[in-house]
UniProtKB/Swiss-Prot annotation:
Entries under InterPro entries matching the protein: AglF-like (IPR053799), GlmU-like (IPR050065), NTP_transferase_dom (IPR005835), Nucleotide-diphossugar_trans (IPR029044)
Family in the record: Belongs to the UDPGP type 2 family.
Annotated knockout phenotype: Mutants exhibit defective or limited motility.
Catalytic activity line of the entry: alpha-D-glucose 1-phosphate + UTP + H(+) = UDP-alpha-D-glucose + diphosphate
A single GO molecular function term of this UniProt record: UTP:glucose-1-phosphate uridylyltransferase activity
UniProt protein name: UTP--glucose-1-phosphate uridylyltransferase AglF
Top-level taxon of the source organism: Archaea
The organism of origin for this protein: Haloferax volcanii (strain ATCC 29605 / DSM 3757 / JCM 8879 / NBRC 14742 / NCIMB 2012 / VKM B-1768 / DS2)
Function: Involved in the assembly of a N-linked pentasaccharide that decorates the S-layer glycoprotein and flagellins. Involved in the biosynthesis of the hexuronic acid found at position 3 of the pentasaccharide.
Length: 243
């Protein structure tokens, strides 16, 4: 299975940590966020890494070059940050099979393998790692509605009145069918091409998307305090493992 990592963002909210580097190169527990992402994807069996870069992309390219732990890396350039569906289309020519998608500003310690296993065994059209959050936080995320079979029936991007508190976490598996859906996406009220709309198009066309509930934790590294929390969690787990 191939893997895509989205790492084009400026990380404005992470300043001053991103004044001289892209968000993915901010260190957490002694190594860049992207290294955490790459390690997990390689451990999950990624045979190819496709990294979407943008802001200060040369720093990422110089650091990782063309391979990581023996897995080849290809870079795709997103010249303008116009949403996740827009970013995903930059890799269309590099992906020809089912693939993992990870947002390159998240730290995971969770059951990512369950998502990959579901994709491989059930031949679902997609599978997402999802988690429940406090209701007053749900409007910050892509919110999922599921049926009794654990299939996602609707995704709404940052709704003012969330119909659910189940949200996407930033780890997905897809078939290449997602690219056609991304081509059909129209700009949202925010002026972005939202991946949630592409997902909704897949659902309305009869595709099956499975929701895998998180077992563990993940943190979106949006602010300096998020970086600090992720670092503390990782260090605590390292300490516990050595006791």
């Amino acid at each position: 299975m191939q893997a895509v990592v989205l790492a084009a963002g400026k990380g404005t909210r992470l300043r001053p940590l991103t004044e001289d580097k892209p968000k993915g190169m901010v260190e957490v527990d002694g190594k860049p966020i992207l290294t955490h992402c790459f390690d997990q994807l390689v451990d999950l069996g990624a045979e190819k890494l496709v990294v979407v870069v943008g802001y200060k992309k040369e720093i990422i390219i110089q650091h990782y070059d063309d391979e990581y732990r023996g897995v080849p890396i290809t870079y795709a350039h997103q010249r303008e940050q116009k949403g996740l569906a827009h970013a995903l289309l930059t890799v269309e020519d590099h992906i020809d099979e089912d693939f993992m998608l990870m947002l390159g500003d998240n730290i995971f310690n969770a059951n990512l393998g369950d998502v990959v296993k579901r994709q491989r065994e059930d031949r679902a059209d997609a599978a997402f790692l999802v988690e429940e959050v406090d209701w007053d936080e749900a409007s910050r995320y892509g919110v999922c509605v599921t049926n009794d079979y654990g299939e996602i029936t609707e995704v709404i991007e940052k709704p003012e009145e969330p119909p659910s508190n189940l949200v996407m976490t930033g780890f997905y598996t897809f078939t290449p069918a997602i690219f056609h859906a991304c081509h059909l996406v129209q700009p949202s009220n925010r002026g972005e091409y939202e991946i949630s709309e592409a997902i909704d198009l897949l659902i309305r066309s009869g595709r099956t998307i499975d929701a895998i509930r998180i077992d563990g934790w993940r943190l979106d590294i949006g602010y300096p305090e998020d970086r600090d929390e992720a670092e503390q969690r990782l260090q605590e787990e390292t300490t516990q493992a050595t006791e």
